[in-house]
Amino acid sequence: MAVKLYDKVILKDERHGVVVEILEPGVAYLIDIELPGPDWDTIEIRDSDISKVLR
């Protein structure tokens, strides 16, 4: 899956987030997960965790 910096993604667990750093292209990323209100959580994910790239 082609994922670029600042792409919006939907994870397989249905959480939405934005790619904020590409750790290893096509393998691992840091994303900011949207939380209720103005909060977010930054997590590391693998390419296999992504369900869909929204761009």
Where are the model-predicted features located?
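Basic/aromatic-rich interaction segments and small domains that mediate binding to polyanionic partners
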Residues: 2-55
